[in-house]
C-alpha cells in the first residue's frame, strides 16, 4: 500500500490490475501468483491511496469457462471501484506453455464468441460502454494512451524494447539493457502508420472509420481497393 501512495503522490492517476478471474483455480491454471482475495485487497488499497481511475482485466474463454465465472469476475472488479475494464479472449500462442500443453476444457470458437457477446452485453448493462473491441469504460474514463495507438497518433516509448511513433515513423529500441544503458543501442526504423495500418486500427474502435478523416490524413478518397482490403480483414476475423 505504501507503494500505491508513493505512485499517487508522484502524480500517477491511473492504475490497472490484471485480475483475469475471480476463481483461484483458474488463476492457478494461468500461472498467476495472486488470488481473488488479493485482487479485492488491491482495489481497496488503491482507493485508500487516492486512485479514482482504476482499470481491471478480465480474461474470457478460459478452460471450462461459464457465464457464472464472468459474472463473478465482473462483480469483483466493479465492486472494487473500477472505471475501466479490459475483457479479452484467451489467445494461445504456439510457443507458449499452453501452446505446448493445451489445457483441457477449452471452448470452441463458437462457444468463445458466445462468451464474448455475453460479456459485452453485461458490461454495457453495468454502465461500461464499449469503445474498442476489448475495452469498456464509464463515460470519460476511456484509455487515452491506447486511443493514441488506434488513431495512429504520436507516442514516445522510453527504455529497452520500447516502441515509438513520431512524425508518422515507427521505431523501437532493441531489448538489450546493457547497450541501452551505455548509449550504444541505435533505434530501429519500423516503417510508419500507412493507410492499411490506419484502417485496421480504426476498425478496432466502435466509432469505426471516418472517411473524411481518412481523406484528410492520406490525401485521397477511400477506394475500392481499400474496401476489398477491409472485407478481407473481416473475413479473416
Model-derived features with residue positions:
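C-terminal scaffold of the Radical SAM
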Residues: 1-220
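Mobile late-domain/C-terminal helix-loop "cap" segments
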Residues: 220-227
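Basic amphipathic alpha-helical segments that dock to polyanions
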Residues: 227-237
Amino acid at each position: 500500500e505504501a507503494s500505491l501512495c508513493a505512485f499517487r503522490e508522484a502524480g500517477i492517476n491511473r492504475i490497472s490490475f490484471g485480475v483475469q478471474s475471480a476463481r483461484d483455480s483458474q488463476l492457478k491454471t494461468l500461472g498467476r501468483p495472486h488470488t481473488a482475495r488479493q485482487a479485492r485487497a488491491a482495489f481497496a488499497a488503491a482507493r485508500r491511496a487516492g486512485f479514482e481511475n482504476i482499470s481491471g482485466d478480465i480474461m474470457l474463454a478460459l478452460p471450462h469457462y461459464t457465464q457464472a465465472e464472468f459474472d463473478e469476475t465482473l462483480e469483483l472488479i466493479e465492486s472494487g471501484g473500477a472505471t475501466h475494464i479490459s475483457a479479452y479472449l484467451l489467445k494461445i500462442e504456439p510457443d507458449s506453455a499452453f501452446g505446448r500443453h493445451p489445457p483441457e476444457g477449452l471452448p470452441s470458437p463458437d462457444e468463445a464468441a458466445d462468451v464474448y457477446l455475453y460479456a459485452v452485453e453485461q458490461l454495457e448493462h453495468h454502465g461500461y460502454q464499449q469503445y474498442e473491441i476489448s475495452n469498456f469504460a464509464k463515460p470519460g474514463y476511456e484509455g487515452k494512451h491506447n486511443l493514441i495507438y488506434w488513431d495512429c497518433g504520436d507516442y514516445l516509448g522510453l527504455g529497452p524494447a520500447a516502441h515509438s511513433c513520431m512524425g508518422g515513423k515507427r521505431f523501437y529500441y532493441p531489448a538489450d539493457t546493457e547497450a541501452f544503458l551505455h548509449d550504444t543501442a541505435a533505434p530501429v526504423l519500423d516503417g510508419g502508420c500507412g493507410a492499411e495500418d490506419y484502417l485496421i486500427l480504426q476498425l478496432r474502435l466502435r466509432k469505426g472509420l471516418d472517411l473524411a478523416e481518412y481523406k484528410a490524413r492520406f490525401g485521397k478518397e477511400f477506394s475500392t481497393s481499400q474496401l476489398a482490403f477491409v472485407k478481407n480483414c473481416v473475413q479473416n476475423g
